[in-house]
Swiss-Prot record:
Intracellular or extracellular location(s): Cytoplasm
Entry annotated with the keyword Transport: no
Alphabetical list of HAMAP family matching this protein: UreG
Major subcellular location class: cytoplasm
Family to which this protein belongs: Belongs to the SIMIBI class G3E GTPase family. UreG subfamily.
Amino-acid positions noted as binding GTP in the UniProt annotation, renumbered to this chain: G11, P12, V13, G14, S15, G16, K17, M18
Natural source organism: Brucella suis biovar 1 (strain 1330)
Stated name of the protein: Urease accessory protein UreG 2
Self-association state and partner proteins as the record states: Homodimer. UreD, UreF and UreG form a complex that acts as a GTP-hydrolysis-dependent molecular chaperone, activating the urease apoprotein by helping to assemble the nickel containing metallocenter of UreC. The UreE protein probably delivers the nickel.
Gene Ontology terms: cellular component: cytoplasm
Function recorded in the entry: Facilitates the functional incorporation of the urease nickel metallocenter. This process requires GTP hydrolysis, probably effectuated by UreG.
A matching Pfam family: cobW
GO BP terms in the entry: urea catabolic process
GO MF annotation, one: GTPase activity
Length: 212
């Protein structure tokens, strides 16, 4: 069986992890990729149901599953990812033609990371509404994630946040690691995020041709 790449999508409650997934999946599917989505909630599978409703007609419901973790969000994706590993392996066996798995963690804090046994690539999502000081607060999600997504750029003027400050601090904390500003309502930045996924996770040779 081929090794299917897995992306972990983490971040604080309400940062827009699910919205990011719902934005990138249709684009990836249009490009010909076959996707699985796995979500985490503590006592429900509400996120999975939301994704199923939003992506109805785009991604079949059977390719979207929710995991009820019953406890701390980071435990289920880091210290003891057994429930998620079982879900991923079951879905991959059911859909062996899959090209990419997107696994959303439950909402957590700046210390969130994923077990390397569970994922191959880490996207961390923060939102502008939480304030422009978030990048400089650092934490594993800010500095160690493979891609940092700064979501909800449209809210900056309403909360007095400076996107330039967030840009400067992200560069300082992340060095050469990529980050992208997004607005899921207008799809601002989503194409850039998909480009990074294709280039760094799916190793799509067409990306370099498109950039030329």
């Amino acid at each position: 069986m081929k090794k299917i790449p897995r992306i972990g999508v983490g971040g604080p409650v309400g940062s827009g992890k699910m919205a990011i997934i719902e934005a990138v999946v249709p684009i990836l599917i249009k490009l010909g990729y076959r996707i699985l989505v796995i979500t985490n909630d503590i006592v429900t599978t509400e996120d999975a149901k939301h994704v199923q409703r939003t992506l109805k007609g785009v991604l079949i419901e059977d390719r979207i599953v929710g995991v009820e973790t019953g406890g701390c969000p980071h435990t289920a994706v880091r210290e003891d990812p057994s429930m998620n590993l079982a879900a991923v392996e079951e879905m991959e066996a059911k859909f062996p033609d899959t090209d990419l798995v997107l696994l959303e963690s439950g909402g957590d804090n700046l210390t969130l990371t994923f077990s390397p046994a569970l994922i191959d690539f880490f996207i961390y999502v923060i939102d502008v509404a939480a304030g422009d000081k978030i990048p400089c607060k650092n934490g594993p999600g800010i500095s160690q994630s493979d891609i940092l997504v700064i979501n909800k750029t449209d809210l900056a003027p309403y909360v007095g946040a400076s996107l330039q400050v967030m840009d400067d601090d992200s560069r300082m904390m992340r060095g050469k690691k990529p980050f992208v500003f997004t607005n899921c309502k207008t799809n601002e930045g989503i194409d850039d995020l998909v480009h990074l996924i294709r280039e760094n996770v799916l190793f799509d040779t067409e990306v370099s041709k498109e950039s030329a």
